[in-house]
């Protein structure tokens, strides 16, 4: 029982931390006729890894990169 309570607490804390790291706005649409390509490698893992107000978004290559929100 204590292990379940501890696991539940950890899940809640992780959810709170990830919600705090998300920046305002939404990622650019990569389902355009000509998607924004960017570099074909991961440049970030979450919004907190991006400078200023940029968000960590998928690019046209399928990798994650910092982008200006729309």
From Swiss-Prot:
One of its GO terms (biological process) is defense response to bacterium. It comes from the Eukaryota. One of its GO terms (cellular component) is extracellular region. GO terms for molecular function: peptidase inhibitor activity. Its main location: secreted. Coiled coil: none annotated. Residues 1-19 form the signal peptide. InterPro entries: Elafin-like_sf, WAP_dom. It is found in: Secreted. Expressed by the venom gland. Pfam families: WAP. Disulfide bonds join 27-57, 40-61, 44-56, 50-66. Keywords: Antibiotic, Antimicrobial, Disulfide bond, Secreted, Signal. Residues 20-70 form the WAP domain. Belongs to the venom waprin family. Damages membranes of susceptible bacteria. Has no hemolytic activity. Not toxic to mice. Does not inhibit the proteinases elastase and cathepsin G. This is Waprin-Thr1.
């Amino acid at each position: 029982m204590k292990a379940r309570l501890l696991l539940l607490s950890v899940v809640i804390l992780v959810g709170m931390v990830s919600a705090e790291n998300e920046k305002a706005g939404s990622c650019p649409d990569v389902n355009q006729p000509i998607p924004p390509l960017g570099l074909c490698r991961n440049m970030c893992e979450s919004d907190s890894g991006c400078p200023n107000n940029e968000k960590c978004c998928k690019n046209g290559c399928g990798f994650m990169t910092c982008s200006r929100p729309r």
